[in-house]
Amino acid sequence: TSANIILYYKGYDTSPLEQYVALAVVAGALSNMGAVAVLNESAHTSLPAGVFKSQELGKHSLEMLREGFPLTSLFCGFVKYEVEGIEGVWMRTYGADCFGLPDFAAHAQGHHEGQKYSDIFNNVLRYLLESGAEMAAGHTMQVGKTTFMKLRDPLDDEYYLQGPGTTLVVELIEEDECNAH
């Protein structure tokens, strides 16, 4: 026998992060009763339910889910895909609009750059979430010692980057390129 359960938040906290944390705790409890996976449809991603067991997260599991758990793991999904006729791999987030944040996309050389972009996107989303700062097309932000990300809107022929919220395309540039445009 198999079944699925749809979880949704019906509490009083207005913070999307707190709502996701509450749902993750329930998913962890359900994994003790045989739940196999947790799917976040708006983030286009899933994880094994066992990841959310309190034994896996440790003594401070709520703090871990709030502060240490990568947003791009489940709350804002990270997806890589190839587009026919285009060299390289597109990497992007989904679901950041649930937090009132933009999704980010980047055109990478290949799948081997996945961790780099996942880390950049996670760090920027976490910064925006915690600081309340806003980013838009035309903005730049330092993401490494000499590396900056420059943001732009998707081009008309980049229809595959459209989503329910704002998507900003990340182009990595070096420090000397910041004021060159």
Model-derived features with residue positions:
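Internal, hydrophobic cores of structured domains that mediate oligomerization or house catalytic pockets
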Residues: 1-76
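Aromatic/basic-lined ligand-recognition segments
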Residues: 43-181
